[in-house]
């Protein structure tokens, strides 16, 4: 498939397949809305994605593996907390802390906030990015927000793209603004040309968990 960017809608959930597909992407995009339940789900999704990435990274990075195992042993309850792990590295594993920083710097997902209904909710994107930075040490990029528009539902019911029928609508202009930010210049190129190659890559990654 000849394309500069391919977008796959993974849907909601934190199944291993969803997490692995997200981790296979060059830079995953999280789409949420300002409702508390939605932002909470988005945060826990990113937390699970990061944890799965780190467990895989620990299998190929000995300092991180030792630090992770040591942290779990000292913690006593078998639970993992990113903030606690960060403090543990700062106190006991300075060498692994550098490796951990490099690992985090390679994960920069993007964010879109959908169904914004008020001026106050315009700040939800920045708030969420700051939350993720504080507790997960992840640097996210905010692609933009989209205002709530009931015409989206109408378009969906009639099975036609709203951008064609409402080209001057605020949400259409907002969508094109996001698309202008979604460039492929900084994205690594995948040397994958067929679905068979993609399926093979996914199976190889899944083997790492067994």
Regions found by a protein language model. Give the residues of each.
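Signal for well-folded cores of large energy- and translation-related assemblies
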Residues: 15, 47-50, 133, 183
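C-terminal lobe/tail of nucleotide-utilizing enzymes
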Residues: 64-210
